């Protein structure tokens, strides 16, 4: 069995010594852990929790400084409700939120926590958060095994990256998926009938983009058929992956091996290149995701956009959302990806694992999930809430995402790499940009990316 201390050292080696492991790989042994147990109500406990929006460590100050109804105010209000509600359940437990950033900054902070623990100190946090690297941590013994019966109401697909041999080593606070957003004004102006605004297949989406693009060119309009995300690195990969999966591929295959040049992926990349010929031109050179969303939602520069649900809560009336189209006319060939899937894991080195698990149980309850969906618009992970009629009245523009989330049929987030991650995503970005904007044979591009990225793993 893999001991926790051994597992934690392997994480440190993987992070600092650059031991090559792709996050899609399965562990050969399970972490050596047992049941967490129940909360000890006879001692004072401080839970140290890494946090990310909408959990705000400075929520009390924000409630005083921010205007009511703003995003920061709503996030602070959510945090206050969470703290107060948990206090009623466990009066002896104090919640201390620690904001360590996101992405590389977060991963670096977690490396330092692990280093200090290995040097003989205490683990600095009871609960770690993250997205891309959480599966790797779970596979290497960093997290304690949760009582899955306490989290039976959490959607399974969002937990896939931290599920090992049927056991859960983490749960998400909130999640997100990709969908197809569309501009009704542009589609109407281009002469597309309303019943055709929502394409059900790849071919129908491509045809609508062609019609809009040609209409815009003939009538001196500033928009294109689609706003496409070509931001280097992970942003473009998050939008491409649903199409790779719909074609039967992925960046890593089911064995965790690099598969960029697989036949399935080549087919998807060829389709994405076809879409790109009808894109709003400036979207293909834009290097900022927020600017792309601004192009689509505020400037009306595209009829369609492949994007997560986060902007839809405040979108204008002419911006609607729909599921991503299927690859095939018979409805087969569907794909998606969990994104903004904020995972929480209880560290195996924590001295307060029971209280930490109780916090995660409360965080994923339908009561708490309802608060932050109402206040922040992030997709909840509670099955009870997702399947309720009430949720459909809160943010109607997000309902298509909710229905897709409930329908399921997909799991897992973006493929990730522990060794040379920045180099790998830079190489991916160059490759994907060439897919969308160049005339070079895609198989040739994919073979080169396979070799270049493979050399970094």
Residue ranges and their predicted role:
Residues 144-154, 197-198, 224-231, 247-268, ...:
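Short, solvent-exposed loop/beta-turn-alpha elements that line the ligand-binding surface or hinge
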Residues 374-426, 430, 434:
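Long, aromatic- and glycine/proline-rich binding clefts that accommodate carbohydrate-like moieties
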Residues 88, 190, 277-278, 315-379, ...:
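Extracytoplasmic/periplasmic substrate-recognition and gating elements
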Residues 34-41, 101, 107, 128-179, ...:
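Hinge/lid segment of periplasmic solute-binding proteins
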Residues 206-211, 254-285:
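Glycine-centered hinge/linker elements that transmit conformational signals in sensory
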Residues 9, 20-133, 194, 354, ...:
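Conserved N-terminal structural module of periplasmic/extracytoplasmic solute-binding proteins
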Residues 99-112, 200-204, 283-297:
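Short helix-initiation/N-cap motifs at beta->coil->alpha
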Residues 169-173, 178, 203-257, 302:
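Extracytoplasmic/periplasmic solute-binding protein
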């Amino acid at each position: 069995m893999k001991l926790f201390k051994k597992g934690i050292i392997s994480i440190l080696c993987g992070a600092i010594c650059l031991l090559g492991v792709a996050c899609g790989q399965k562990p050969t042994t399970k972490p050596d852990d047992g049941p967490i147990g129940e909360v000890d109500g006879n001692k004072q406990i401080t839970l140290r929790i890494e946090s990310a929006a909408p959990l705000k460590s400075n929520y009390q100050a924000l409630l005083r400084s921010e205007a009511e109804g703003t995003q920061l105010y709503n996030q602070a209000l959510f945090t206050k409700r969470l703290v107060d509600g948990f206090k009623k359940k466990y009066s002896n437990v104090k919640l201390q939120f620690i904001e360590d950033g996101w992405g590389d900054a977060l991963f670096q902070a977690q490396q330092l926590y692990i280093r200090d623990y290995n040097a003989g100190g205490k683990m600095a946090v009871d609960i770690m958060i993250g997205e891309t690297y959480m599966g790797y941590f779970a596979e290497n013994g960093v997290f304690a095994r949760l009582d899955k019966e306490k989290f039976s109401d959490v959607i399974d697909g969002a937990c896939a990256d931290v599920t090992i041999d049927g056991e859960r080593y983490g749960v998400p606070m909130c999640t997100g998926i990709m969908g197809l957003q569309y501009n009704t004004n542009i589609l109407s102006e281009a002469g597309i009938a309303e019943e055709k605004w929502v394409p059900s297949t790849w071919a129908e989406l491509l045809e609508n983009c062609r019609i809009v693009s040609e209409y815009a060119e003939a009538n001196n309009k500033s928009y294109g058929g689609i706003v496409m995300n070509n931001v280097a690195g992970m942003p473009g990969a998050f939008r491409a992956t649903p199409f790779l999966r719909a074609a039967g591929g992925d960046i890593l295959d089911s064995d965790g091996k690099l598969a960029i040049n697989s036949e399935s992926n080549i087919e998807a990349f060829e389709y994405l290149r076809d879409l790109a010929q009808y894109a709003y031109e400036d979207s293909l050179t834009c290097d900022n995701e927020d600017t792309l969303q601004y192009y689509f939602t505020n400037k009306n520069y595209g009829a369609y956009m492949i994007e997560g649900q986060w902007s839809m809560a405040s979108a204008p009336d002419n911006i609607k959302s729909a599921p991503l189209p299927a690859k095939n006319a018979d409805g087969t060939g569907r794909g998606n990806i969990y994104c903004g899937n904020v995972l929480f894991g209880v560290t195996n080195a924590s001295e307060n694992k029971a209280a930490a698990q109780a916090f995660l149980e409360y965080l994923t309850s339908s009561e708490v999930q309802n608060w932050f969906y109402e206040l922040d618009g992030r997709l909840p992970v509670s099955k009870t809430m997702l399947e309720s009629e009430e949720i459909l009245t809160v943010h109607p523009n997000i309902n298509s995402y909710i229905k897709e989330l409930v329908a399921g049929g997909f799991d897992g987030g973006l493929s990730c790499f522990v060794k040379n991650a920045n180099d790998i995503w830079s190489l991916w970005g160059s490759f994907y940009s060439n897919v969308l904007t160049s005339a070079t044979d895609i198989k040739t591009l994919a073979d080169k990316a396979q070799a270049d990225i493979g050399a970094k793993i």
